[in-house]
């Protein structure tokens, strides 16, 4: 953890033992250890839930486990690099990142590597890259940079909020062509929430919301499967072996888990009964094997992750690190919304959406991007605490 240590403390400070030790800690320990804990839980549940699918696809029970280890190794190496990148670099290159994301989305459509009727992936050897995940992070970086530069205009002029909305709509069109309706919802709600949080007028955002709803409704109507998803959501038991199959199997998994679960590795629904058991519906398998108490514990850990991310943003804003603060708050919104949609989907609260559960679901691109965003949060917290410590040392010298 040498990255989070600082050499500016070169003389003892008479602040008491507790404060003296805390001044050396330049990262959020709660966030860091919760992140590791969730990744560990995710690895265990993926290892359990992916065995039947691995046998069916590759005749290898460890097929997905091996791939996860590769993804985790790549993610670890990139995390070390990202922790060393100053946040100002992300701000300066946010527009280029967004442009690259758009190019990758277009490339995915051209290559048309279709899986389950969706063209969302760029194949690179045996690895699959999903540009939609990168587009979330790059757009959030761009939005934070825009709000940092145009903070006064956003509060006073309606047209100032139109530019990020237009760019969001362009991304939404590219995502819809894949199609990836879940990512569109994430971008749409996160954008409106952050604009409101940082000064945009509520009446203007309501106008934008209504306008976009009128755009979205025809897109739902022209695709029969989307209408069917909504109808199935109201009562999946009307068609338990057809359109409601995935949701009913998910609910059965929750019911089997009861309070304390069936035990690790003892899930029955993962045996080809529940589709996407190790990806979008991994929380159902977790609830079946660990029970309601295990599921609630994981939800609590995820909630604290989202809360700590918002606290990191608040600290950065307090010392006028506006880009860092807006970025951290945006990432917190993104994580919280995606967690809510995934858990709501598998528990029957929301219509089904193809969104993974952050840090836990199998998915190389989604896991890599969420961990990258988490490393950005740790870097923001590091720079914030470092600035506070430097200011404190200047005060002690006066």
Curated annotation (Swiss-Prot):
InterPro entries per the UniProt record, alphabetical: Cell_cycle_FtsW-rel_CS, FtsW, FtsW/RodA
GO-annotated cellular components: cell division site; plasma membrane
GO process annotations (BP): cell wall organization; FtsZ-dependent cytokinesis; peptidoglycan biosynthetic process; regulation of cell shape
Transmembrane segments: 30-50, 68-88, 92-112, 121-141, 155-177, 181-200, 202-222, 293-313, 326-346, 355-375
Intervals, Periplasmic compartment: 51-67, 113-120, 178-180, 223-292, 347-354
Enzyme class per UniProt: transferase
Positions in the Cytoplasmic compartment: 1-29, 89-91, 142-154, 201, 314-325, 376-398
Pathway where this protein functions: Cell wall biogenesis; peptidoglycan biosynthesis
GO molecular function: lipid-linked peptidoglycan transporter activity; peptidoglycan glycosyltransferase activity
Pfam families for this protein: FTSW_RODA_SPOVE (PF01098)
Reactions performed catalytically: [GlcNAc-(1->4)-Mur2Ac(oyl-L-Ala-gamma-D-Glu-L-Lys-D-Ala-D-Ala)](n)-di-trans,octa-cis-undecaprenyl diphosphate + beta-D-GlcNAc-(1->4)-Mur2Ac(oyl-L-Ala-gamma-D-Glu-L-Lys-D-Ala-D-Ala)-di-trans,octa-cis-undecaprenyl diphosphate = [GlcNAc-(1->4)-Mur2Ac(oyl-L-Ala-gamma-D-Glu-L-Lys-D-Ala-D-Ala)](n+1)-di-trans,octa-cis-undecaprenyl diphosphate + di-trans,octa-cis-undecaprenyl diphosphate + H(+)
Keywords: Cell cycle, Cell division, Cell inner membrane, Cell membrane, Cell shape, Cell wall biogenesis/degradation, Glycosyltransferase, Membrane, Peptidoglycan synthesis, Transferase, Transmembrane, Transmembrane helix
Topology class, membrane: Multi-pass membrane protein
Compartmental location: Cell inner membrane
Primary residence: membrane
Signal peptide: none
EC identifiers of the protein: 2.4.99.28
Biological function: Peptidoglycan polymerase that is essential for cell division.
Similarity annotation: Belongs to the SEDS family. FtsW subfamily.
Protein name as catalogued: Probable peptidoglycan glycosyltransferase FtsW
Organism from which the protein derives: Blochmanniella pennsylvanica (strain BPEN)
């Amino acid at each position: 953890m040498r990255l989070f240590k600082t050499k500016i403390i070169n003389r003892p400070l008479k602040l008491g033992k507790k404060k003296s030790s805390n001044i050396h800690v330049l990262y959020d320990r709660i966030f860091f250890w919760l992140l590791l804990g969730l990744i560990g839980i995710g690895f265990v549940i993926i290892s359990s839930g992916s065995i039947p699918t691995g046998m069916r696809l590759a005749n290898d029970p460890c097929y997905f486990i091996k791939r996860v280890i590769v993804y985790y190794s790549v993610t670890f190496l990139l995390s070390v690099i990202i922790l060393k990148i100053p946040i100002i670099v992300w701000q300066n290159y946010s527009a280029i990142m967004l442009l690259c994301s758009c190019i990758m989305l277009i490339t995915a459509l051209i290559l048309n590597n279709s899986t389950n009727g969706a063209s969302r992936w760029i194949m690179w050897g045996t690895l699959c890259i999903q540009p939609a995940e990168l587009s979330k992070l790059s757009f959030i970086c761009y939005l934070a940079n825009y709000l940092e530069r145009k903070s006064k205009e956003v509060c006073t002029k309606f047209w100032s909020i139109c530019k990020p909305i237009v760019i969001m709509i362009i991304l939404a069109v590219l995502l819809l062509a894949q199609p990836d309706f879940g990512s569109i919802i994430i971008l749409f709600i996160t954008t409106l929430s952050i604009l409101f949080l940082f000064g945009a007028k509520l009446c203007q955002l309501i106008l934008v919301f209504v306008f976009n709803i009128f755009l979205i409704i025809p897109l739902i109507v022209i695709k029969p499967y989307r209408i069917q998803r909504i109808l199935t959501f109201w009562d999946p038991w009307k068609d338990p072996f057809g359109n409601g199959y995935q949701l009913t199997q998910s609910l059965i998994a929750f019911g089997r888990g009861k309070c304390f679960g069936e035990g690790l590795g003892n899930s029955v629904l993962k045996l080809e009964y529940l589709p996407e058991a190790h990806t979008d519906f991994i929380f159902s398998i977790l609830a079946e094997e660990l029970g309601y108490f295990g599921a609630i514990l994981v939800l609590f850990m995820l909630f604290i992750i989202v809360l700590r991310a918002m606290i990191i943003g608040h600290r950065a804003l307090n010392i006028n690190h506006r880009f860092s603060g807006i970025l951290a708050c945006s990432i917190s919104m993104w994580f919280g919304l995606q967690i809510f949609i995934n858990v709501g989907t598998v528990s029957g609260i929301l219509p089904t959406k193809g969104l993974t559960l952050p840090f836990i679901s199998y998915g190389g691109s989604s896991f890599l991007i969420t961990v990258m965003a988490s490393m950005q949060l740790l870097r923001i917290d590091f720079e914030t605490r470092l600035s506070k410590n430097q200011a404190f040392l200047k005060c002690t010298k006066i």
